[in-house]
Structures are given as C-alpha cells and as structure tokens.
C-alpha cells in the first residue's frame, strides 16, 4: 500500500474537471496510485459533474472540493493540470515532482452535452494513461 504513487489532478475550482478526473483516476489507476484532486479555489462539487459521473455508474457524491494542499503537491509523483488557468497559476512544484498539462474545456454553465463530452474525454485520457503511462 505504501509503495503506491500519488497523482494530483488540478483545475481552477475543483468543481467539474478535476472532480471527474479524480473519479476516473480512482477507477482506472486506484490499484497503483493514490488519486487526489484540488483547485486554485474550492467552488464545491458541481451537481452536473455528479450527474454526469452517475451516468457511467461512478458515484462522486462523497468527493469534496478542496484547495491545493502543499503536502500532497510536494510529495506527488505526478501533478496533472486540467485547465490553462491552473497550469499558469499552480504553485511551483519541486523539481522531483513531474508535472504535465492535459487541457479540457470547462463544462460549467454550458449545456448538458458538454458535461457528457468532457466527462468522456477525461475518462478516455486517464484510461490511455493507465494503459500506456503517457
């Protein structure tokens, strides 16, 4: 258990994209990775993100919206920013923490199909990472 790696998904509000990424991460990576998400701010989990994940039988009602925790950030093996704002303003990561940017559109305030599209794109990206390490 202790030799699990840590992956940290970050976006602006820890409301939609990073919440969905955390859920997909737990599904696809949970046996090898500790999966966390956070935001530059904490806007609360978007009800449509909960609904979108329910459609694929993943329950995120118990996930919380959190601001970036320096302890997790500094010990993460991989930090993934999901929006350009988070990529630009994310606190600097130590040199030994690998950081990548996987950009996704923000579905907040958009029509329902956007939540479904972004949910599926994030799921596919994390599934690919679980299979290829990239």
Swiss-Prot record:
Q: What UniProt keywords apply to this chain's record, in alphabetical order? A: Arsenical resistance, Cytoplasm, Disulfide bond, Oxidoreductase, Redox-active center
Reactions catalysed, semicolon-separated, are: arsenate + [thioredoxin]-dithiol + H(+) = arsenite + [thioredoxin]-disulfide + H2O
The record's disulfide annotation reads 11-83, 83-90
Its Gene Ontology cellular component terms are: cytoplasm
Query: Which EC class is this protein assigned?
Result: oxidoreductase
EC no. given is: 1.20.4.4
Supply the Gene3D superfamilies for this chain.
Answer: 3.40.50.2300
Which GO biological process annotations does it have?
response to arsenic-containing substance
Annotated active site residues, numbered on this chain, are: 11 (nucleophile), 83 (nucleophile), 90 (nucleophile)
Which cellular compartments is it found in? Cytoplasm
Q: What is its main location?
A: cytoplasm
Output the superkingdom of the source species: Bacteria
InterPro entries listed in its UniProt record: Arsenate_reductase_ArsC, Ptyr_pPase, Ptyr_pPase_sf
Q: Molecular function (GO) terms listed?
A: arsenate reductase (thioredoxin) activity; protein tyrosine phosphatase activity
Q: Name the job this protein performs.
A: Catalyzes the reduction of arsenate [As(V)] to arsenite [As(III)].
Task: List the PANTHER family hit by this protein, alphabetically.
Answer: ARSENATE REDUCTASE
Regarding protein family, the annotation reads: Belongs to the low molecular weight phosphotyrosine protein phosphatase family. Thioredoxin-coupled ArsC subfamily.
Protein name according to UniProt: Arsenate reductase
Query: Which species does the entry assign this protein to?
Result: Bacillus cereus (strain Q1)
């Amino acid at each position: 258990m202790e030799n699990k790696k840590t992956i940290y998904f970050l976006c602006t509000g820890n409301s939609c994209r990073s919440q969905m990424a955390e859920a997909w991460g737990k599904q696809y990576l949970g046996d090898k990775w500790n999966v966390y998400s956070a935001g530059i701010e904490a806007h609360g989990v978007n009800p449509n993100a909960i609904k979108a994940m329910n459609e694929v039988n993943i329950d995120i009602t118990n996930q919380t919206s959190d601001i970036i925790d320096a302890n997790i950030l500094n010990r993460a093996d991989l930090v993934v920013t999901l929006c350009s704002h988070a990529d630009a303003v994310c606190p600097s990561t130590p040199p030994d923490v690998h950081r990548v940017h996987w950009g996704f559109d923000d579905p907040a305030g958009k029509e329902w199909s956007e939540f479904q599209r972004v949910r599926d794109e994030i799921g596919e990206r994390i599934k690919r990472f679980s299979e290829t390490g990239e």
